[in-house]
């Protein structure tokens, strides 16, 4: 289970806890985890969107622990990308806080290894995606078909995660614009939407998510 140094507080703490409870400790995890993340991420995003109706401060839009949680999900997606060969291992490592690696599954289904494996920037172990059998009716998917489905699943998770972070970032920018005088050098609407120019933790995390998302757009 994902753990944070601080307990989730404020609006949407329940939804944040629901997402965090799905994440395993760092180490091997099964790919089947990823499809379970999409709906809870969407629920959290909807909750944060609704929080603007009752909260008058930027802190009300960003529950405690949101960015560490998002970074963890990003690393899990990076590990999945490496396992299924969706992106080059070095690329996956370069868009996040650390590299992801992979190990053979207990069932003997081979998984792509990561070259240049190294620990994450925090010094902790990384997540390693273990392939799980994928079926379509009675047909077991293999090779390109398997990778295609994996790509679609990872893409869905990253899309939900980016929508969540974008919602938080835009709401925070809205609050700041109402309380501060923005000069000619202020952040424009485009930067607010995509989080490329902001200096905050949310915008930086969003940029990392979008970087990986852009690498795995389904063909």
From Swiss-Prot:
In residue numbers, the region (Disordered) covers 97-124
Q: Specify the inducers.
A: Expression is controlled by the asperlin biosynthesis cluster-specific transcription factor alnR.
Q: Where is the composition biased (Low complexity)?
A: 105-116
What domain of life? Eukaryota
Q: What does the protein in this record do?
A: Part of the gene cluster that mediates the biosynthesis of asperlin, a polyketide showing anti-inflammatory, antitumor and antibiotic activities. The first step of the asperlin biosynthesis is the production of the intermediate 2,4,6-octatrienoic acid by the highly redusing polyketide synthase alnA with cleavage of the PKS product by the esterase alnB. 2,4,6-octatrienoic acid is further converted to asperlin via several steps involving the remaining enzymes from the cluster.
The knockout note for this entry states: Fully eliminates the production of asperlin.
- Annotated protein name in UniProt: Asperlin biosynthesis cluster protein I
| Pathway assigned in UniProt | Polyketide biosynthesis
């Amino acid at each position: 289970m994902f753990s944070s140094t601080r307990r989730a507080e404020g609006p949407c703490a329940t939804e944040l806890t629901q997402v965090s409870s799905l994440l395993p400790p760092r180490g091997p995890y099964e790919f089947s985890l990823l499809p379970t993340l999409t709906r809870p991420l969407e629920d959290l995003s909807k909750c944060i969107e609704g929080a603007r109706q009752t909260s008058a401060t930027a802190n009300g839009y960003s529950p405690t622990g949101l960015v560490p949680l998002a970074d963890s999900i990003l690393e899990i997606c990076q590990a999945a990308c490496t396992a299924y060969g969706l992106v080059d291992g070095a690329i996956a490592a370069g868009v996040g806080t650390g590299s992801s690696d992979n190990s053979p599954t207990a069932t003997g289904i081979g998984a792509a290894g990561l070259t240049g494996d190294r620990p994450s920037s925090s010094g902790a172990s990384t997540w390693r995606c273990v392939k799980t059998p994928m079926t379509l009716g009675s047909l077991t998917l293999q090779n390109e078909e398997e990778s295609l489905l994996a790509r679609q699943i990872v893409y869905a998770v990253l899309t939900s995660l980016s929508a969540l972070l974008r919602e938080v970032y835009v709401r925070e920018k809205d609050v700041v614009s109402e309380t501060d005088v923005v000069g000619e050098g202020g952040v424009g609407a485009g930067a607010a939407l995509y989080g490329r120019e902001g200096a905050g933790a949310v915008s930086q995390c969003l940029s990392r998510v979008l970087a990986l998302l852009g690498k795995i757009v389904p063909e």
